[in-house]
């Protein structure tokens, strides 16, 4: 679609700005509804739409019949038969703030002449709206929303969605009903689909919404049948042969009775205070839901009151979509710097013009690695899409190529570490470039010290990041061994470090001198060596010296140590500087641990030789306690599920590990089942 030059909203004439806004919104609609390739974040679309609404309200003569404010969606794609909706599928007006919700409630209550008003609250799914037609209880047709008046016939594709009944059940089945709802894809199903795409060497989907839309609109229903789509009913069109339920909540209950899938995250509340309470409650658990939502929908609950409120050109007056803070937004990429991680990993970081996204102001976002920058074709000066969901680190999703300035510059990975000046190296088979400076690099030094002090490493309480920053910047500590040379007087002089804090840290350091071999190995920060591998090494060799002198072949004999991990361990101990630091750490008066003979080849215990994975929250014990009990029984507790896993112990809010176990047919136990297993009872 042709593009027009972007007029400045501050200086351009309203007619010129409105023309550009209509063009930009229509282009975005086409990409979203027809191509299933949205390239404009929802928040940016909403902002532009609101601006066009404002211009048209101030200048009614600028309203055109084809303005996006006068219609619902996009054009009917070729390849599907058009379906005219007997009752239009309208979209909803949006609210973004508490003030918007209060204003909506006031308009409703003023029109109805009473307060408080009962509202049915439900989730706003991030999927594709469709209409299902049932005649005498039999599913006969499915159509997409399209432009609201005319959609696309996707009947054969929808027949493949297992959650949609082909025949309604119960005693109150109508002669005719158009069920409105949303086709979506659960996150776990989306992850599985993308894994299949990767395995087949095919393009991955950007998000569950794209995957759902693309899957539903496959020309071959057999392709749709292979895609794990789901459906929730939430509205109604034409109804014949039975009386319309008196409230929206009763409508959804009736749907449920007839076997239609209805989401359980819903409630009937009173007034603005009630809907805002529901909104904030849902917002707190949004990231834990198994599917994507982008807000909450409020509908006046009583049907007669809905009829009294009526409709405007594109939306009902009795409903409002309350949108969450956008998880995606547009901003300008000012620069690309690189940061150095604990293991020397060089990560490109986008420096951004400040943008509010995901409930926070974002100025930096990860670009992951050099290959990702190239794949996404991100350049300095671009207008980029930034995504921030929950506590996830903000990332740059992509660039708007149509807004790229002529002077946009490609990113060039530096050849020297920005912190220590050492050479940056990248192995042929790895995506990550790394600083070769090792523990000499101050950036790595800080991260290495922080890792060394972690609770699961040497557990040095009081040695936080700010203290480590001071110790390194004042050149008081260069390696982990230097920590044990620190004295009370030195610590007491640190900025914002009182005498009590200094003494507490001295006590923590003294306590940390007495540890286990496994903790010490983990504390060294060897690449690819986590807690589990550190324990395997300690059990297999019994003492540190054999590990330090082991060949790659000898390391490969350790349980679950593969070629990559074996090579990383071997290279770490082959580096003379690392050996020097280790000798300093185990010098007299420094770190000690109990050493013993190598573990027997076959571990003892009722779970000897078994691999167990923990996931979710157990009701009566923490994960660490469960892990210790399993390991004491001879089990290896792994961090991920594979074909080698013998059992998965799942608690509340178990995630992808549980899904993986079910997919592989691995036995899944709850806490009671785990206890029985520990007692020697088979499952």
UniProtKB/Swiss-Prot annotation:
Superkingdom, natural source: Bacteria
The species this protein was found in: Paraburkholderia phymatum (strain DSM 17167 / CIP 108236 / LMG 21445 / STM815) (Burkholderia phymatum)
Transmembrane segments: none
SMART domains: BRCT, HhH1, LIGANc
Biological processes per GO annotation: DNA repair; DNA replication
Co-factor(s): Mg(2+); Mn(2+)
GO cellular component, one term: cytosol
Lineage: Bacteria, Pseudomonadati, Pseudomonadota, Betaproteobacteria, Burkholderiales
Class of enzymatic activity (EC top level): ligase
Entry's EC annotation: 6.5.1.2
Binding, NAD(+): 42-46, 91-92, 122, 145, 182, 299, 323
Protein family per UniProt: Belongs to the NAD-dependent DNA ligase family. LigA subfamily.
GO molecular function: DNA binding; DNA ligase (NAD+) activity; metal ion binding
InterPro entries the record matches: BRCT_dom (IPR001357), BRCT_dom_sf (IPR036420), DisA/LigA_HHH (IPR041663), DNA_ligase (IPR001679), DNA_ligase_AS (IPR018239), DNA_ligase_CS (IPR033136), DNAligase_adenylation (IPR013839), DNAligase_N (IPR013840)
Any one Pfam family match given in the protein's UniProt record, by short name: DNA_ligase_aden
UniProt KW keywords: DNA damage, DNA repair, DNA replication, Ligase, Magnesium, Manganese, Metal-binding, NAD, Zinc
Record protein name field: DNA ligase
Residues noted as binding Zn(2+) in the record, renumbered to the chain: 417, 420, 435, 441
Main function: DNA ligase that catalyzes the formation of phosphodiester linkages between 5'-phosphoryl and 3'-hydroxyl groups in double-stranded DNA using NAD as a coenzyme and as the energy source for the reaction. It is essential for DNA replication and repair of damaged DNA.
